[in-house]
C-alpha cells in the first residue's frame, strides 16, 4: 500500500440528530434542517445541505486517491443539548448511513436533496463500484477518521494535522480543505500562516450555502452579507489574534465547550517550558518568529 500523504479536512459546523425519526416513515439522512442542531443563522442558506456536500466531496476525493489520503471530520462536543457527541462523530455516522443507503438502493433520489447532492451521491456510488471498495472498508479501514477537540477553525486545521500524524505516523505533505468558500481567506491567510504550514501545499475547495428560491439580486446580497459578516466576526479577529488566545475569540471557544474537553494537541504549540499552557499571547508576530517559524515539523526548510 502507498503511504498516506494527504489530509482531506472537513471542518464541521453542526451536529446531526441521529435519533430523530421522520413522522412519515422516511429515512433521516440529514436532508431536513430539523435533523440538525442548527444556529439561527444556519437556516436561511440551507446550511445543512452544504454540510452534506462538504462531506460527500471529501469522500469523493478520497476514493480518487484511496491509498494516499485520509479524510478527517473535525469538530468537538459543542452543543450541550446534543449530549456528549461531537460534530465530527455525527458527520461520520451520517455519511456512513447515507452511503450505505445509496449503495443498497437503485433509486438514490433523497427528498430535499438538490441536483448537486444527487450528482455527488451518484459519483460516490460509481467510484465505490469502480474502485471495488465496500462501505466497511471505506469507513472501518482507517481512511476516514475524526478529530474531536476543535472549537474553531484554527483548531480545525492544527488539530487535524496532529490527528493525521496520530493515525499515519507522519505529518501530511499536503492538505485539501472542503468548507465554505467565504472562509478560505481565514484558513489560508490566517491559520496556515500562523502555524507555518506551506500555503502552496494547501488546496481549498469552497462550497457555500445556497438559499432556496432566491433571485440573482437576493443571492448577491446574501453572499455579500456572508463576506461582510465573515470579515467582522472572524477574519478581522484572527488577523489580530492569530492563535485565538485573547478575549473575544477565547470567549467564543469557551462557549462551544460545554463538556470541558481538553485537546491533547494544544501542548504542541501552546506550552511553556514548564508544561503549562500559554494563555493570552501578547505579541503574535513575536511568538511566531521565536516559537513557530521554521520550527514546526512541516515548516519549509530555512532559505
Curated annotation (Swiss-Prot):
Keyword Cytoplasm carried by entry? yes
The listed locations are:
Cytoplasm
Keywords annotated in UniProt: Cytoplasm
Q: Does the keyword Cytoplasm apply?
A: yes
Q: Which GO terms describe its cellular component?
A: cytoplasm
Q: State the source organism's domain of life.
A: Eukaryota
Q: What else is known?
A: Present with 892 molecules/cell in log phase SD medium.
- What is the official name of this protein in its record? Uncharacterized protein YOR238W
Amino acid at each position: 500500500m502507498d503511504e498516506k500523504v494527504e489530509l482531506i479536512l472537513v471542518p464541521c459546523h453542526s451536529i446531526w440528530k441521529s435519533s430523530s425519526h421522520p413522522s412519515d416513515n422516511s429515512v433521516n439522512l440529514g436532508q431536513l434542517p430539523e435533523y440538525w442542531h442548527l444556529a439561527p443563522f444556519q437556516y436561511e442558506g440551507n446550511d445543512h445541505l452544504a454540510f452534506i456536500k462538504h462531506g460527500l466531496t471529501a469522500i469523493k476525493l478520497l476514493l480518487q486517491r484511496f491509498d494516499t489520503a485520509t479524510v478527517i471530520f473535525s469538530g468537538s462536543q459543542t452543543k450541550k443539548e446534543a449530549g456528549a457527541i461531537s460534530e465530527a462523530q455525527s458527520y461520520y455516522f451520517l455519511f456512513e448511513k447515507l452511503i450505505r443507503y445509496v449503495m443498497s438502493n437503485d433509486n438514490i433520489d433523497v427528498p430535499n436533496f438538490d441536483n448537486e447532492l444527487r450528482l455527488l451521491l451518484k459519483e460516490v456510488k460509481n467510484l465505490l463500484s469502480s474502485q471495488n471498495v465496500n462501505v466497511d472498508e471505506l469507513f472501518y479501514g482507517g481512511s476516514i477518521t475524526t478529530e474531536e477537540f476543535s472549537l474553531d477553525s484554527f483548531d480545525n486545521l492544527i488539530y487535524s494535522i496532529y490527528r493525521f500524524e496520530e493515525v499515519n505516523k507522519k505529518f501530511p505533505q499536503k492538505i485539501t480543505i472542503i468548507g465554505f468558500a467565504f472562509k478560505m481567506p481565514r484558513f489560508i491567510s490566517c491559520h496556515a500562516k500562523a502555524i507555518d504550514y506551506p500555503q502552496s501545499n494547501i488546496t481549498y475547495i469552497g462550497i457555500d450555502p445556497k438559499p432556496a428560491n432566491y433571485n440573482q439580486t437576493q443571492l448577491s446580497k446574501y453572499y455579500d452579507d456572508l463576506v461582510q459578516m465573515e470579515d467582522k466576526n472572524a477574519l478581522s479577529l484572527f488577523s489580530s489574534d492569530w492563535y485565538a488566545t485573547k478575549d473575544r475569540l477565547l470567549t467564543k471557544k469557551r462557549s462551544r465547550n460545554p463538556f470541558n474537553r481538553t485537546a491533547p494537541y494544544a501542548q504542541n504549540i501552546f506550552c511553556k517550558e514548564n508544561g503549562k499552557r500559554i494563555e493570552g499571547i501578547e505579541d503574535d508576530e513575536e511568538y511566531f518568529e521565536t516559537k513557530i517559524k521554521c520550527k514546526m515539523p512541516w515548516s519549509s526548510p530555512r532559505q
